[in-house]
Amino acid sequence: MASRFPKFSQGLSQDPTTRRIWFGIATAHDFESHDGITEEKLYQKIFASHFGQLAVIFLWTSGNLFHVAWQGNFEAWSQDPLHVRPIAHAIWDPHFGQPAVEAFTRGGASGPVNISYSGVYQWWYTQGIRTNLELYQGALFLLGLAAVSLAAGWLHLQPKWQPKISWFKNAESRLNHHLSGLFGVSSLAWSGHLVHVAIPESRGQHVGWDNLLTTLPHPAGLAPFFSGQWSVYSQNPDSASHLFSTSQGSGTAILTFLGGFHPQTQSLWLTDIAHHHLAIAVLFIIAGHQYRTNFGIGHSIREILESHVPPGGGLGQGHKGLYDTLNNSLHFQLGLALASLGVITSLVAQHMYSLPSYAFIAQDFTTQAALYTHHQYIAGFIMSGAFAHGAIFFIRDYNPEQNKGNVLARMLEHKEAIISHLSWASLFLGFHTLGLYVHNDVVQAFGNPEKQILIEPVFAQWIQSSHGKTLYGFDVFLSSTASPAFYAGQSLWLPGWLDSINSNTNSLFLTIGPGDFLVHHAIALGLHTTTLILVKGALDARGSKLMPDKKEFGYSFPCDGPGRGGTCDISAWDAFYLAIFWMLNTIGWVTFYWHWKHLALWQGNAAQFNESSTYLMGWLRDYLWLNSSQLINGYNPFGMNSLSVWAWMFLFGHLIWATGFMFLISWRGYWQELIETLAWAHERTPLANLVRWKDKPVALSIVQARLVGLAHFSVGYIFTYAAFLIASTSGKFG
C-alpha cells in the first residue's frame, strides 16, 4: 500500500478521517514530535532548512531587482527622484478596460503599472546603483547565491556532510563566528562599500568593477591610516549646498561625525553612516575574539553563568544551571532570538522615519507610512512568537532539578506576583485612559470643549528638550546655550544635530501635546495587556492552581472534559491565541497614531491632530472616516481611478476579517452536524455521488478552528489597514 500523508507520523497517517490532513499540516514543522526523531537528527534537519530559507530570501530579492530592471523606471527616477513615481512592476490584466488602463498608466510608463512603496528605489540609489544593467547584474548574482544555498542545504542532508551534535552545541565557537563573522565582517564590508562605491557615486564619480582598484576613495590614500592621523578622513565633508549624485558642493571626507541630515535628500550623511559601520565592525570583530575555543584563552560561557550568583544569598542561585538549560533547549534559544529580533524590528520601524538613511525616502510619504506600518506589524508577530516558544520550553525542555533556586525557578515561584502586578498595571492604564477619552468625548458632544481634561506630557517634553529641542523653553542640557555639551556639539561632535532637531521639515523628536499623552497611554495599555497574557501563558504553561498537571497535556489542548470543570481555554496555546488579538489591537493604535500625526504634519496642519486626538470621536471621524472616504464612495460618475484597487482591497480585507468570526464564534458540534448533513445530501444526489472520498469528513478541532479564525482575523485586519494606509496617503501626496 502506498504510504499516506503524513510520512513523519505512522499513527496519524492511519487516521480514517480528514483530521489526518489538518493535523499533518499542523505538525509538519514540529520535528520533535515526528517518528524516529533523535536529538541529532532534529538539529541536522533545522540546520539544512536554514539554507532553504536563505535560498527563498535570495530568490525573492533577485526577483525585486529583476522586475524593476525589466519593467520599472529606475534610470528615469534616479534623474529626478522627487518628481518621478517609482514603478514596482507592470500589471498584466486581460480584464482591464480602457478606463482602467488609463488609470494605472503612470510614472512615465506605456501601460498599466504598480507604483513602488517599498523604498527599494531609494535604497539602491543610495548604495550607488544608477543603471538597469547594474540591477540585472545584482539579480543574477542573487540568483546564483540562491542556487548555492539550495545546493548547500541538500549537501548538509547527506550523511557524510551532516554536522555532529557536538558541533551544534559548541556555543563559544558559534558566538565568536556570529559576532566577528556575521556582524563584524559584514559591517566592515558595508562600510567599505559605502566608502569605495556609494560615497563617490553620491559625488558624481562612478566606481565600477573596471575602476574599483584604481580609484582612491580619499585623496590622501592610506597614508593617514598608517601614520595615525585618522582625523584627515573627516576633513572637508560635503557642504550644505551639495547636490546628491553630482560633484557640486561635494567634499572629500569619507568618515565623519556631522549629525543631522543632508539638506537636499533629508537623509543621514553617507559619511556618517560609513563611520558608524566601521565603528560597529571594530567593536564586533573584537567581541568575536572573547570566547574560549581551541586556544584555551578567553571566556567560557559556562563559567560566566556559574559564577553569576548574587552576593548575600537573598536572591537565590542566580545563573547556576542556565548553561545546560539554554544550550540543550532549541525553544529557549529561539525564544531569546525572537525576542531580540522583535525588538530590533520595532526599532527599525522607529528609526527608518526619524533618522532616514536612504536619499529622498523622507519625501516619499506613502513609502514612509508603508515601511513604518510593515515593520511594526512584523515586530508584533515576532515578539509574540518569543513568548510562545518560551512556553513550549517550560513544557518540553525545563528540568526543575537542573535549575533549583536559579532565576528561572524563582520566576516560576513568584509568578503570581508578576502576573498580578501586570494585571494591575493594565487595569490602571485601561480605566484611566478610557476615562479621560470618554470624559473628553462627553464634554465635546455637549458643546463644552474647554472642559476637556488635557494633560501636557511634561516629562517627555523635558527629555526632548535635554536632547536639544528648544520649542518647549525648558533650557536644559543641549537646549541650554550655557551648557558645555551645547558648545562642544557646535564643532566637536554632531554639529548638524541641533539644526535637525529644531527643524520642522523632518520627523525627529516630533512636537507632542495632550493628544500624544493620551494615545501614548492607550498604547501602553495595549502593550501591558498583551504582555500580561503572554507572560501568564508562559509562566502557567507547566501548571497552575486550577490545573497543576497542565504540563502533561502539552502546549495546546482544548479542555480536560467535564470531570474537571473550568479546564477549558487555559493551555499555553490559548494564551498565545488571545495575545495575538491584543497585539494586533495595539499595533493598530500605534500605526493609527503615527499615520494621523504625520498626515497632519505633511499637510502643514498639525492643529488637526492636536485638536481632534483628545477624544475618541475625533479619532473615528477625523482620522478613520475622513481618510477612508476615497475608499468607500463606491461607484461614482467619474469611473475608475488609481485608488480603485485599494478600494476593492479595503472591502475584501473586511470580508476576510469578518470570515474569521465564523470560525471564532461557533462551536464544533454545529460544524459536525452541518458536515454530516452535506455529506448525506451529497451521497444521495445523482452525478454528485459519483465523486467519493476516502477520509470521513469531520469538523476541525476546537484548537484548529481557533487557528483558522485567528489567521483570517489577522490577514483581514492587516489587508484592510494596508489598503487604507496606502490609498489615503498616496491619494493626498501621490
From Swiss-Prot:
Q: Which GO terms describe its cellular component?
A: chloroplast thylakoid membrane; photosystem I
Query: Which reactions are catalysed by this chain?
Result: reduced [plastocyanin] + hnu + oxidized [2Fe-2S]-[ferredoxin] = oxidized [plastocyanin] + reduced [2Fe-2S]-[ferredoxin]
Positions annotated to bind chlorophyll a B3: 662, 670
| UniProt-listed InterPro entries | PSI_PsaA/B, PSI_PsaA/B_CS, PSI_PsaA/B_sf, PSI_PsaB
Name the chain's protein.
Photosystem I P700 chlorophyll a apoprotein A2
Please give the biological process terms from Gene Ontology that the record holds.
Answer: photosynthesis
Indicate the quaternary assembly: The PsaA/B heterodimer binds the P700 chlorophyll special pair and subsequent electron acceptors. PSI consists of a core antenna complex that captures photons, and an electron transfer chain that converts photonic excitation into a charge separation. The eukaryotic PSI reaction center is composed of at least 11 subunits.
**What gene does this protein come from?**
psaB
